[in-house]
Amino acid sequence: MAASAKKKNKKGKTISLTDFLAEDGGTGGGSTYVSKPVSWADETDDLEGDVSTTWHSNDDDVYRAPPIDRSILPTAPRAAREPNIDRSRLPKSPPYTAFLGNLPYDVTEESIKEFFRGLNISAVRLPREPSNPERLKGFGYAEFEDLDSLLSALSLNEESLGNRRIRVDVADQAQDKDRDDRSFGRDRNRDSDKTDTDWRARPATDSFDDYPPRRGDDSFGDKYRDRYDSDRYRDGYRDGYRDGPRRDMDRYGGRDRYDDRGSRDYDRGYDSRIGSGRRAFGSGYRRDDDYRGGGDRYEDRYDRRDDRSWSSRDDYSRDDYRRDDRGPPQRPKLNLKPRSTPKEDDSSASTSQSTRAASIFGGAKPVDTAAREREVEERLQKEQEKLQRQLDEPKLERRPRERHPSWRSEETQERERSRTGSESSQTGTSTTSSRNARRRESEKSLENETLNKEEDCHSPTSKPPKPDQPLKVMPAPPPKENAWVKRSSNPPARSQSSDTEQQSPTSGGGKVAPAQPSEEGPGRKDENKVDGMNAPKGQTGNSSRGPGDGGNRDHWKESDRKDGKKDQDSRSAPEPKKPEENPASKFSSASKYAALSVDGEDENEGEDYAE
């Protein structure tokens, strides 16, 4: 409802008090009022009951300073009532002195007399700083000729003077003496004003003489407050006057209470930022200090704290300083006595600490990377040499075995030469050429099988030299015995022996059956393998073939025997290890004669078919 009234008022509409109270639910009187009263506070002076605590904030001074009962309006602005002062505090005889606080620095006696115009003011005193006589302390005193002028001056509390809200209060003789003799100045007044206007602070009910200062740097304010307010608090003025300044903070030209509250909160926050937040005092005088806007105000405040010499707090602090001054001369004596004996230990400890600080890695030593790299390279080189030696040793062991393909190839070359010689001397038919071709193929296949079984790792090396072997063997020296000479000398003997051999089977059986060679072939093959000779092959031949074929075969057999002996000599000479020599020689000889036996069977079969 109050908000609606405010809105109407802002629009320029006015409302009577009775209507306003009726809307608010209060009990209004039965009398009627003018629609536009000059001062509704005069009309509600004797009004009893609940009254609205919300006030209009007008720019004009229509509702200014009417006396209102504070019990009826507990939170009314100060501008709506006269100051409620305990008359017991008022002086009974002149001088009637009023204390003026929160004065601007540029204030003069004439400006103060102008502020209290219409009042019987007799004198004005403005104390100055002892260190700087040109600078005011921020407070003063005004003496009035009569008590009514003093009461009127007290009603101007929290009025504006030079952009500051000054504090007007009653000053007794004890306060004046304390201010003048001890040069306490405006700090005491400031703290006393804060105590009076701060509704959050808890007042002290005992006098200054009963208790020492309680709150550190602000103890001087407590002293003055205790001495200044003890009587009126004890007389029951505590509930009256102390609660009054809580509402007196809002006094200035009908200003709205809520608006002033916001500024008060801002001033408290600002003052706490300045550094006075430790004090349990509200806004009031301190808030007006902030309006002054001068940093010198706070600097002077702290300077005066340092200059004060009247309080027991200062005496106590001076005693502390004296004890502190006596302390330092004794400290070196106490410190020098124990240091004289363990001086070396301290030096050793310092050196150990310095060494620890120097070696941030503790006991670790630096690593020579170059030496480490050399060691690693040497080790790797040794390992490589060792591996190379291990690879070379198997090569040396395998060298004797690598000679086997060479003597086999020589053997095959000797056979081929003997065969070519015998074939060139023969005048046989195409059956001989077919037998030679089959013999070569069987020899090659058998040699490949034996080589693969005996040496798997050397099989690739043995195959490539075959096409190159005729180039290597071409310049070889001729054999010890000439095969042509031996062939020309041996045929008559061989023919005789063959004739005698041929007679033995004919005498036993008469005629030779045509199927007999094929039946006796396997038996002859076994005899050839056991004996290691191919001489019985001549028994199967026909006597009508002539000495040419028989001599050619005998010569071929003898050349094979000679080649086998040569191969055995060549194998036994270069091989240093006997365990490897024996199985190699047996296997090679077995494979060689097996090939010859197969060739012999092929010849016998060919002859049988030819017959």
UniProtKB/Swiss-Prot annotation:
Superkingdom as given in the UniProt entry: Eukaryota
The record's subunit annotation is: Self-associates and interacts with EIF3 p170 subunit.
Family matches, as Gene3D superfamilies: 3.30.70.330
Per the record, its GO cellular-component terms are: cytosol; eukaryotic translation initiation factor 4F complex
One term of GO molecular function: ribosomal small subunit binding
- Locate the cross-link: Glycyl lysine isopeptide (Lys-Gly) (interchain with G-Cter in SUMO2): K343
Its biological purpose: Required for the binding of mRNA to ribosomes. Functions in close association with EIF4-F and EIF4-A. Binds near the 5'-terminal cap of mRNA in presence of EIF-4F and ATP. Promotes the ATPase activity and the ATP-dependent RNA unwinding activity of both EIF4-A and EIF4-F.
Record key words, sorted: Acetylation, Initiation factor, Isopeptide bond, Phosphoprotein, Protein biosynthesis, RNA-binding, Ubl conjugation
Query: Where does the record place Acidic residues bias?
Result: 599-611
Give the N6-acetyllysine positions (modified residues): K365, K586
Report the leader peptide range.
none
Q: Which organism is it from?
A: Homo sapiens
Which Pfam families does this chain map to?
RRM_1
User: Where Phosphoserine occurs along the chain?
Assistant: 93, 192, 207, 219, 283, 359, 406, 409, 418, 422, 425, 445, 459, 462, 497-498, 504, 597
Coiled-coil intervals? none
Polar residues: bias regions: 487-506
Biased segments, Low complexity type? 348-359, 421-435, 584-597
In its UniProt entry, what is this protein called? Eukaryotic translation initiation factor 4B
Identify residues that carry Phosphothreonine. T412, T500, T506
Compositionally skewed regions (Basic residues) per UniProt: 1-13
- Identify the coding gene: EIF4B
